[in-house]
């Protein structure tokens, strides 16, 4: 075990000894969804590796990405709250205190944070025996059996896209009827419900805007990335990526390879509102796996972004042509993030780049 994980385990044990069980909040009225806390959990000091972090790392300059995947179900549940602990320097003690007012915890776990996250889930369950706990994120998508066997505090885990699985549970649907989840039944036997169909383009347009939840629950001045203007806001206009690169996180553990796009009208409307909500923001970042993979759609979106006078950047393909680049530049694009993984043809072949 890494030394830093040992340190987190020690802190958990200390918390077990010092925390007294806190009283539960009042039960919600009939017909209301479970009062839900969405959590990107506390992590190692200055480590950006939790919810939605594409490049987990501890950097010389403290920096964090937004927990965008948690914003969509958070925006669909009345009374919910999104807590992004690392950039806001919220401790586990503070998280546990917050949970006294909630009935359901949705925690976005990561491979590097797994040991600490499962230990804290067990402590939370000891403190609030009635609370329901679901884990989402890469390690539970790839190894659901291991997750459920190692962490006895879990009520269930979600595999891959979890937006509607979480909503259905919070609104009272029985576990055995919810697609895309795994759980232990009353006999302790792990049950894997059938996979949930990927969210459709039409559903993407109907979902809440991530930037609205940022404005509701987060302090955007806490977020910074060295290569972007500060403060910045990141969001997605698509899900999925048709490329088969073996090293990429989200297509393989969350969004899959089917490329689905929001309408350009929906994206432009969100950006117009975001500019009004965040006058202090210097730059927007489209964190799509490959923002400009479809020329016609990229140019159409740029035509709608151009009147807004935004500064923005994105992930890009090296094969982007001149016409597309010109449209992007005229619409306010400042920077392209392009992957140069190797100069060795065999390595590129091996990683399916």
Whereabouts are the PLM-identified features?
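Acidic, low-complexity intrinsically disordered segments
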Residues: 2-270
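Radical SAM [4Fe-4S] cluster-binding motif and immediate context
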Residues: 210-353
């Amino acid at each position: 075990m890494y030394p830093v994980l040992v340190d987190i385990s020690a802190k958990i044990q200390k918390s077990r000894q010092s925390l007294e069980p806190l009283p539960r909040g009042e039960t919600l009225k009939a017909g209301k969804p479970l009062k839900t806390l969405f959590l990107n959990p506390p992590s190692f000091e200055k480590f950006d590796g939790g919810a939605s972090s594409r490049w987990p790392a501890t950097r010389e300059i403290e920096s964090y990405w937004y927990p965008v995947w948690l914003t969509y179900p958070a925006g669909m549940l009345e009374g919910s709250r999104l807590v992004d602990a690392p950039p806001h320097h919220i401790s586990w003690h503070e998280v546990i205190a917050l949970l006294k007012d909630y009935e359901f915890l949705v925690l976005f776990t990561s491979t590097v944070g797994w040991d600490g996250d499962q230990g804290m889930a067990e402590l939370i369950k000891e403190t609030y025996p009635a609370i329901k706990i679901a884990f989402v994120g890469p390690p539970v998508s790839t190894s659901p059996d291991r997750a459920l066997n190692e962490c006895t505090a879990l009520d269930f885990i979600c595999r891959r896209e979890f937006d509607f699985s979480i909503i259905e549970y919070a609104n009272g649907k029985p576990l055995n009827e919810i697609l895309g989840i795994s759980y232990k039944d009353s006999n302790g036997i792990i049950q894997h419900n059938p996979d949930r169909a990927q969210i459709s383009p039409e559903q993407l347009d109907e979902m809440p805007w991530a930037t609205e939840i940022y404005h509701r629950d987060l302090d955007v001045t806490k977020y910074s990335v060295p290569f972007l203007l500060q403060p910045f806001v990141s969001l997605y206009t698509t899900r999925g990526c048709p490329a088969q690169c073996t090293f990429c996180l989200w297509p393989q553990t969350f969004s899959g390879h089917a490329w689905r796009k929001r309408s350009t009208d929906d994206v432009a409307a969100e950006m117009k509102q975001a500019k009004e909500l965040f006058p202090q923001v210097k730059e927007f970042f489209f964190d799509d796996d490959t923002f400009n993979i479809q020329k016609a759609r990229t140019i159409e979106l740029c035509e709608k972004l151009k009147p807004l006078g935004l500064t923005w950047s994105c992930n890009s393909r090296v094969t982007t042509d001149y016409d597309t680049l010109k449209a992007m530049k005229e619409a306010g694009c400042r920077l392209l993030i392009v992957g140069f993984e190797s100069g060795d043809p065999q390595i590129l072949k091996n990683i399916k780049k």
